[in-house]
């Protein structure tokens, strides 16, 4: 019994792909949920041309990245001193236990700072995973070396938030901190400018106001940029000038996919925080029709435990009316505030401060809370018209709650009686199901990762990424980077295996079609016995002891993997004979094959057929001999012989 995936092309063309080769098939993901995808005709030239254009763009991108990296390596930088006693004391004052990811990221950043070339590191981590603490430790290292540090943020609200966090974190240490934003009066701004120029100010936190011509530093040593992609083109150009010879740390809550990280390894330094802080609980998420009774109960339940609430109404024109309705519903004794991006500076600053101080119990707001707001006491979130927001945005907004050990609740609502589009329904299902940290959560992160890849590579490359799909583009970029470095991209010899053996995932073992497809793909992508054992352990943990067809399926995957290493592109059984076809005459490991054919046990049943362009090794099976086990043994012996011959040639 074998399973196949049926792929339909325009017209009546159909392709059946064996489940054992599902590693060759990936779902098209281009980052645009609603954008229709134009299908290529089977055997046509459209796809070849599109892929060629994307490959050329990836090559240009690789050249540009390598040139930028080489230029930065030539610039003189400041080598910061190793950690001092004060640095250790500052880090010991952290009120939480660091995760391994945080500690590793901190060590990588310090190593960069102590080097004599300017640091250019990207720190990626989900909302609430502790990037700010990592950045503040880098700031402390900079200040203790007698230099100034700047933290650049996209919004005024976030500048105030970081300022408050820094004041608390550096309390008791001789660090002079200032904030530069539109909340400042003329006199206050002049004082900050003067302190920066004279060196009195050690750390300044601000919006793009920091990029203005009148901002002069006495001795800037570290620039921390939070959510760089939110800045405009002009600001980014000014940022490049400012960061040329100072250590730069960029923070991103949009995850950069591991595959892209690997493709750019050695070109763009990246640190990732993938694990949530200790004691952090996933947010309990509900998707439901908007119902004032349910909402009132949810708010009262949060207020009863001393917490606060975000109520997101994303229309500025009607936000005051919404707040009035909540007052009527909850009673005048409940303190309700309003926050949106069109408010004047003082008004918005005052509201956010009142919320932080606990004076406002329910904040009716727009998506202004999406970036950086960190108030651990707000642990219930209600979103109106959640079906209008993208998965990435919903995830970011939900990340504003659940920032303490207390359980948090999110209510994603849509209008009563509204029939959701298929896309919106899928999005809301994903945000509900993937609240957990872990494997399911990573599936929901797919949309975020595509956005992260687009942010890192720029809008032009995002277009090419959409034309061929996310996975294919990353493969092309990785190959282009290796080529630009003068390294050879690994040649992929694909191998099909068609043996008379029952190898499949029975429905009785994994009932969900979607999960079966995912496991099929993961099994087909196995390359080593260690990977196979890890996946087997996971299967046992999730579904119980696997039946024989599942184990045979994993053996077929390992057979394909070993066969690829020795240049075999097809394994096929016809009755009592198995043929191993090589990908051309050059692919045949002649010495290894001849050594195997000359063994007494193989003399009558193993022959090399060199006719045609694709040489074949033919193996005759004895009665009752297991085809899969025999094929595994033969391919394993060939690989060992080939490796030994290569060692002898090297010596």
Give the ranges of each region predicted by the language model.
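Upstream accessory/linker segments immediately N-terminal to the RecA-like ATPase cores of bacterial MutS
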Residues: 1-103, 494
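C-terminal helicase module of SF1/SF2 nucleic-acid helicases/translocases
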Residues: 75, 292-310, 314, 318-571, ...
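N-terminal pre-P-loop "Q-motif" helix
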Residues: 95-119, 133
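Conserved SF1/SF2 helicase motif Ia
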Residues: 120, 134-163, 171-175
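Loop/turn-to-beta-strand initiation segments
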Residues: 147-149, 176, 199-203, 219-222, ...
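Post-DEXD/H (motif II) to motif III coupling segment of the RecA-like Helicase ATP-binding lobe
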Residues: 217-222, 228-306
């Amino acid at each position: 019994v074998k399973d196949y995936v049926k792929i339909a092309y325009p017209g009546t063309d159909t392709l059946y792909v064996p489940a054992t080769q599902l590693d060759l098939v990936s779902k098209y993901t281009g980052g645009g949920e609603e954008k229709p995808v134009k299908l290529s005709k089977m055997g046509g030239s459209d796809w070849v041309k599109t892929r060629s254009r994307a490959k050329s763009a990836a090559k240009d991108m690789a050249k540009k990245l390598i040139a930028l990296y080489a230029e930065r390596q030539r610039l003189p930088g400041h080598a910061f001193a190793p950690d001092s006693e004060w640095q250790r004391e500052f880090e010991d004052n952290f009120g939480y236990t660091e995760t391994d990811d945080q500690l590793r990221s901190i060590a990588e950043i310090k190593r960069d700072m102590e080097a004599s070339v300017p640091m250019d590191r990207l720190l990626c981590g989900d909302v609430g995973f502790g990037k700010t603490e990592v950045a503040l430790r880098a700031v402390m290292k900079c200040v203790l070396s007698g230099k100034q540090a700047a933290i650049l943020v996209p919004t005024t609200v976030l500048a105030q938030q970081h300022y408050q966090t820094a004041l608390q974190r550096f309390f008791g240490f001789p660090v002079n901190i200032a904030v530069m934003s539109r909340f400042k009066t003329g006199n206050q701004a002049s004082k900050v400018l003067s302190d920066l120029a004279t060196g009195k100010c050690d750390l300044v936190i601000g919006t793009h106001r920091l990029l203005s011509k009148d901002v002069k530093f006495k001795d800037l040593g570290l620039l921390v940029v939070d959510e760089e992609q939110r800045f405009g083109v002009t600001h980014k150009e000014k940022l490049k000038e400012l960061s040329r010879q100072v250590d730069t740390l960029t923070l991103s809550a949009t995850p950069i996919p591991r595959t892209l990280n690997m493709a750019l390894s050695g070109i763009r330094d990246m640190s990732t925080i993938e694990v949530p802080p200790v004691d952090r609980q996933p947010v309990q998420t509900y998707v439901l029709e908007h119902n004032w009774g349910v909402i009132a109960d949810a708010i009262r339940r949060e207020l009863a435990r001393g917490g606060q609430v975000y109520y997101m109404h994303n229309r500025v024109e009607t936000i005051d009316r919404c707040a009035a309705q909540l007052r009527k519903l909850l009673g005048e004794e409940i303190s309700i505030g309003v926050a949106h991006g069109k408010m004047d500076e003082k008004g918005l600053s005052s509201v956010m401060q009142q919320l932080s101080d606990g004076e406002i119990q329910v904040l009716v707001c727009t998506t202004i809370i999406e970036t950086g707001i960190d108030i651990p006491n707000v642990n219930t979130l209600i979103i109106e018209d959640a079906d209008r927001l993208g998965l990435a945005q919903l995830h970011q907004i939900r990340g504003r709650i659940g920032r303490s050990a207390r359980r948090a609740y999110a209510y994603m609502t849509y209008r009563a009686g509204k029939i959701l589009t298929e896309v919106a329904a899928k999005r809301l299902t994903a945000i509900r199901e993937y609240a957990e940290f872990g494997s399911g959560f990573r599936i929901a992160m797919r949309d975020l990762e595509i956005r992260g890849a687009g942010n890192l590579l720029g809008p032009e490359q995002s277009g090419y990424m959409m034309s061929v799909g996310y996975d294919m583009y990353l493969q092309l970029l990785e190959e282009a980077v290796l080529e630009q470095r003068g390294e050879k991209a690994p040649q992929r010899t694909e191998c099909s295996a068609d043996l008379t053996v029952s190898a499949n995932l029975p429905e009785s073992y994994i009932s969900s079609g979607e999960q079966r497809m995912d496991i099929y793909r993961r099994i087909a992508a196995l390359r080593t016995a260690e990977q196979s054992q890890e996946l087997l352990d996971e299967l046992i943990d999730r579904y119980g002891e696997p039946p024989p067809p599942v184990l045979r399926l994993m053996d077929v995957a390992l057979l394909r993997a070993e066969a690829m290493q020795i240049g075999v592109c097809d394994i096929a059984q016809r009755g009592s004979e198995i043929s191993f076809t090589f990908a051309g005459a050059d692919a045949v490991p002649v010495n290894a094959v001849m050594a195997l054919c000359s063994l007494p046990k193989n003399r009558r049943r193993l022959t090399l057929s060199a006719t045609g362009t694709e040489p074949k090794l033919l193996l005759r099976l004895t009665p009752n001999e297991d085809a899969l086990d025999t094929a595994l043994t033969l391919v394993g012996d060939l690989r060992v012989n080939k490796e030994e011959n290569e060692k002898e040639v090297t010596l």
